Amino acid sequence: MAQGRGCALLSLVGCVALLAAACATPVGAVRVEPDVVHRTLTGSVLSVGTPSIPTQNVLHEQNLAERFDEEPEAALADLHAAVVSGRRGVSALFALSELSFFHAERTHKRAYYLAAAVYAYAFLFPDDESTDPDPFDPRLRLAADLYNRGITAALASENRAYVDLRSGVFALPFGELHVSFDRDDLI
């Protein structure tokens, strides 16, 4: 009989512990200073050296986050194919720009700097005006900066002391870009 009471008591204690764990709040809140929150929400490859939250969201939506860490060029090719096929829209186009720049910064491959500029330009000036970026979209300013920085790095002189504006055929990860440039057109 004592053994039965012991089992009952042990079962009761187990049930109370289980009930207490089930009633615990699974989510908590921690106070964070506003400037820390702002830096986290507005951080990008240009400001903190990591892709922005919108770009990370695209990687997760496409199940490419892990692949980008392991095989960035393959992940970029997959995302490029999704955009070209029409399965993904402007969010992925922006992500391609930022991720191409991020990869270029790590590898110093000019083709990826130029790709960042091409994707940023396509995001800023879409063929379909109904997909023009909202002037209040924080990605708009970042895309303009990615365009400028991508062009500057892609066309930098060998010693990177200046930008060498010139005509030519430039390699891209997904093809090539033909550029015609006439110095007489400069002001």
Outline where the language-model segments fall.
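Bacterial N-terminal signal peptides that target proteins for export
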Residues: 1-12
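C-terminal motif of bacterial Sec signal peptides marking the signal peptidase cleavage site
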Residues: 19-22
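Processing junctions and N-termini across compartments
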Residues: 14-17
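Extended, non-transmembrane interaction/recognition domains
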Residues: 183-187
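N-terminal alpha-helical interaction modules that lie
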Residues: 24-106, 110-182
